[in-house]
């Protein structure tokens, strides 16, 4: 299964790369756009990211420290392509994302169980193959753990 991980800002790349490694050891082909795509206000997606996004069966959005224009474009493109998506965000960025993504899961470090419930609820609602649901659940759970660990590291 091919997964595209769109991350909010350059600082979120660490979480995305950890998810990529965890996905790879579980048999997933995971693409994470390079950090240079999060610098500046690029107008278009780079060609490699665009191709990988088109090939992906699942798109996971990780917005922990900010929302770069490249991430916004990737997520909008994924929506336009009808990709199975799940977007995870800290509460600070939820207001920016809620109006665009019905499948937003807000990760509150004080109440991680609520985010897990949101992920499971979303996965039950989408009409996707069983493998895609399992992959999304696994990646969502891993992302939740990594985001929580990242918040502990900052404290």
Show where each model-derived region lies:
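Short, glycine/charged-enriched secondary-structure capping and boundary segments
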Residues: 18-21, 73-77, 100-103
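Long, low-complexity, intrinsically disordered polar/charged segments
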Residues: 1-13, 49-68, 113-127, 131
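Short secondary-structure transition/capping segments
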Residues: 2-9, 75-87, 133-143
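C-terminal interaction surface of TIR/SEFIR-family domains
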Residues: 13, 92-155
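Conserved beta-strand-loop-alpha-helix hinge of the TIR/SEFIR fold
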Residues: 50-94
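Short, structured coil segments at secondary-structure junctions
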Residues: 26, 81, 99-103
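Conserved N-terminal substructure of TIR/SEFIR domains
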Residues: 1-58, 141-155
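Structural signal for conserved beta-strand scaffold positions within catalytic alpha/beta enzyme cores
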Residues: 32, 87, 106-108
């Amino acid at each position: 299964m091919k997964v595209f991980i769109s991350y909010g800002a350059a600082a979120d790349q660490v979480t995305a790369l950890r998810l990529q490694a965890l996905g790879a050891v579980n048999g997933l082909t995971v693409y994470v756009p390079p950090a240079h795509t999060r610098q500046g206000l690029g107008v278009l997606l780079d060609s490699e990211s665009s191709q990988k996004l088109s090939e992906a069966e699942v798109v996971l959005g990780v917005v922990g420290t900010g929302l770069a224009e490249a991430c916004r474009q990737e997520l909008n493109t994924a929506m336009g392509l009808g990709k199975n998506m799940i977007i995870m965000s800290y509460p600070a960025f939820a207001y920016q994302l809620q109006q665009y993504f019905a499948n937003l899961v807000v990760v509150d470090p004080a109440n991680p169980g609520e985010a897990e419930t949101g992920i499971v609820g979303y996965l039950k609602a989408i009409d996707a193959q069983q493998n895609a649901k399992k992959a999304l659940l696994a990646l969502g759970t891993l992302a939740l753990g990594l985001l929580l660990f990242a918040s502990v590291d900052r404290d």
